[in-house]
Amino acid sequence: MKVVHVVRQFHPSIGGMEEVVLNVARQHQATSADTVEVVTLDRVFTDPSGRLSAHDTHQGLPIRRIGYRGSSRYPLAPSVLDAIRSADVVHLHGIDFFYDYLALTKPLHGKPMVVSTHGGFFHTAYASCMKQLWFQTLTRISALAYARVIATSENDGDLFAEVVAPSRLRVIENGVDVQKYAGQGATTPGRTMLYFGRWSVNKGLIETLALLQAALKRDPQWRLIIAGREYDLNESDLRKAIAERGLQDKVQLSMSPSQEQLRALMQQAQFFVCLSRHEGFGIAAVEAMSAGLIPILSDIPPFVRLASESGQGVIVNRDKIEAAADQVQALALHADNDFDTRRTASMAYVSRYDWKHVVGRYIDEYHDALGIPRVQEAVR
């Protein structure tokens, strides 16, 4: 069986969806005799002037890149039809042009397809009314072309239940590479928060600066590290926001750090902070907990569930910064006394998200889409 993953961004782009595709494909390839390929666009959205090679390999996975026109919000790439020609099963990632176009053209290509939701397209408030109309019409109709719609979180499951029949909707929460940063967080108590991920308005970075400002009134030892890559906020935007709040000596920016550099930053931090407005799942929070960082998270459903089930960290309201700062300071004071216990508990909880426990469910979906039983195979 050959499975072709179709995703708008992949290596060398870095992000949550890219990480999921990498791990599903890599684990599938490692545990079966099946063939796996990734089809993606030939430009990284944050550097659209640079065109990438049409064929590549990343961590043993073959990559085919295709051109596109239009914006990064809805890139038009009809040549995807040729790119999936050799597939037995197509696994779409995200609700975008590929999702709609491959559904529309299914009578032409005839490929069995499954799709992972990855939060849909509700990550920001941009064009929210139009998005709702699109979701209730085109997204609903396109879903009929897919053998299975795989919601990547309980939150997505509730959302897509509005437009997908229960018989074709399944929740498979994302796995996470919990070994990548395992145990890399600081081993002694302190007052350093770390954010890593996209530099996006959606991620609540401006609110995070406000939280730091309020926390410093309670304890002058607080620091913040913001690591990641530019998105709709760039380095200049963040430095301006930092300067406006007089936080130049309290905030460290690290743009596009390597994994080794991010590990080094984690070693300086005790807490992971993310005041995101929306997450389909929240991979970075799980990765941070695998490092032993204690989470400080916004009150959105995936984060509330993560904090509730793990019993770790605090959930704050990013619109009530003073109250949030009180919670964060109280958390730090408690952690001064039992930091090692909290650190160990965070790491232990997220072991359940290891990809080795998750990938078999995806392989089952591929076989169901083909209508053939799965034969268990020994790991190669």
Curated annotation (Swiss-Prot):
This is GDP-mannose:cellobiosyl-diphosphopolyprenol alpha-mannosyltransferase. Transmembrane segments: none annotated. It catalyses: beta-D-Glc-(1->4)-alpha-D-Glc-di-trans,octa-cis-undecaprenyl diphosphate + GDP-alpha-D-mannose = alpha-D-Man-(1->3)-beta-D-Glc-(1->4)-alpha-D-Glc-1-di-trans,octa-cis-undecaprenyl diphosphate + GDP + H(+). Belongs to the glycosyltransferase group 1 family. Glycosyltransferase 4 subfamily. The gene is gumH. One of its GO terms (molecular function) is glycosyltransferase activity. Its EC number is 2.4.1.252. Involved in the biosynthesis of the exopolysaccharide xanthan, a polymer that is comprised of repeating pentasaccharide units with the structure of a beta-(1,4)-linked D-glucose backbone with trisaccharide side chains composed of mannose-beta-(1,4)-glucuronic acid-beta-(1,2)-mannose attached to alternate glucose residues in the backbone by alpha-(1,3) linkages. It holds the Pfam family Glyco_transf_4. One of its GO terms (biological process) is polysaccharide biosynthetic process. It is an enzyme of class 2 (transferase). CDD domains: GT4_PimA-like. It comes from the Bacteria. Keywords: Exopolysaccharide synthesis, Glycosyltransferase, Transferase. InterPro entries: Glyco_trans_1 (IPR001296), Glyco_trans_4-like_N (IPR028098), Glycosyltransferase_grp1 (IPR050194).
